[in-house]
Amino acid sequence: MSAIVVLGAGPAGAAVALGLRRLGYPVTLVSEWRRFAALEGVSVRVLDALRAAGLDQALADAALPSQRQVSWNGQQHAQNIEFLLDRPRFDRGLREDLRQAGVEVIEGRVLTVKSSLAGYRIDIEGRAALSADFLVEARGRQAPAQGKGLRGPETVSLLNRWQGAPGSTASAVESLEHGWAWMARRADGQCYWQWTVDVGSVRLPGKAQLLDYCHQQRLQSALARTFFGDAPQPDVQLHARSSTAILSPQVCGKNWIRVGDAAMAVDPLSGNGVFQSLSSALQAPVVINTLLRKPERAALAQRFHQHRVEQLFLRFARTGRDFYADEQRWRQQPFWQARRTWPDTQVAQAKADFAALRIEPMPVLRDGFVDEADVVITPDQPLGIWHVQGLEVAPLLRRVWTEPVKDVLAGLTPEQSRVFKGWLVSQGYRPSPSPSGRGG
C-alpha cells in the first residue's frame, strides 16, 4: 500500500490523517510544536466540525465558553457565545487523537522535501529521512510557496500575551483607525490582545520599541482599558505573524495535495482559522483515495479539490470584505480602503434566481471516491448541488422544467416531496398555472 506522509499536525493535517486511517491507509505525520502559545475564538459550529473529524481528545478541556463583545463602526453589542480554544492544549490533544488512531507521529522539523520519479524524500532534523509515495502539505503559512497565487492586502497581526489576575473568561473585538483588535481573557488570568494592521501604511517601530507601541495603542482604546482593567501588564510576550489572505495557485497534483492554510489562508476577520483549515481538509482523504486507487480519475479529483479550495477562499474573502465595509468612520484610511473592495465586488451570498438554475456534470464525492454526476448550478453555489437531504435534485429539476410540479412530486414519498418543494422555493421557484417549457 502507498506510503503517505502528512507534513503538519494542525487541524487540517490531523483531519486528513484521521480520514486516511479510516480508509485503511497507513499514515506517517511529521510536525514540530508551535513557537507561541496562541488562543483562538471558535463557534459551536467549529467544535461540531472538529468532533465530526474525530478530534475528541483535542477538544477535551481545550475550549472555554465566552460572551464576545463587539465594538464596530462606533456601535457596541454582545454577540453569540464563542469558545476560547487554548492552542497548546488543543495541539497536544490532536497528537493524542492521531496516536490513538494508529498514525505514526514524528516530532521534528522538516529540513527539505525532494521529489523524484520514485516519490518523495523528506529530511528531518535529527532523524533518518523518510520516503513517501504521496505527500500531504499541511504546514500552514510555513509551507513553501508554489508560484504566485492570489494575495490580499499585505497584513500583519501583532499578538501580545501576558499574565494578569485570575477572573472571568471574556473576549471582544473592536475596529480601530488603523486596523482592528481581538482581545481575550482566560479565567486563569492569561490575557491576549492581537492588533491586525496594514503592512504598507502603518510605520511600526523596531522590535525593541514595538511592545511599548502596542501598549500605547491599548491605552488609547476605551474598550481595551475597560476589558483588561488598570492592573500592570508585566512581561508581555510579542509575536508578529503574517495574516495576509493567500490562495495557492495549485493545490493538488497526482501524488501531492495541499490542505488548510497551505492551500488557502484567509484574513482572520473573514472567519475562524480552524474552520477554514477544516473546510479544505475534510474532502482531501477522498481525493487522495481517488488519486491512488482510481488514477484514471486523477484530473477529475484534482479539479474537484482545486475548485473547492478556490470557491471557499473567495467566499471567506468576500465575507471579510463585507465586515470591513461595515466600518464607515475611517473609509479613507489605507487599511480600510484597501479591504472594503477586495477581492472583488461580487456579493458574498447571491440571491436565489430560479431562472438562472442550470444543470451540468461536475465532480462529486461518491462511495469514497471522486466521481462525476449532474448537479444543479445556482447563483450562490457555482460548484453545484447534488443532493438535498439525500435526494438527488438534478433529475427532478429537469422534469420540473417540462412537466407540472404535481406530476414530479407524485413519484416521491411524502418526506421527499416536502424536502424537494422546500428546496424549489428556496431557489426562487413560484408556482405558475403553466409549465415553463424549459429544457435541461
Could you describe each region identified by the protein language model?
Residues 77-97, 202-206:
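Short beta-strand to alpha-helix junction loop
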Residues 337-399, 418-433, 437-440:
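Acidic, low-complexity/disordered tracts enriched in E/D and polar residues
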Residues 112, 129, 207-321, 328-329:
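FAD/FMN-dependent oxidoreductases across multiple families
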Residues 303-359:
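Mid-to-C-terminal Rossmann-like scaffold of FAD/NAD(P)H-dependent oxidoreductases
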Residues 99-229, 247, 264:
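Predominantly flavin-linked oxidoreductase catalytic cores and closely associated redox partners
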Residues 1-12:
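Beta1/beta-strand and adjacent pyrophosphate-binding region of the FAD-binding site
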Residues 33-69:
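N-terminal FAD cofactor-binding segment of flavoenzymes
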Residues 9, 18-39:
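Glycine-rich FAD pyrophosphate-binding loop
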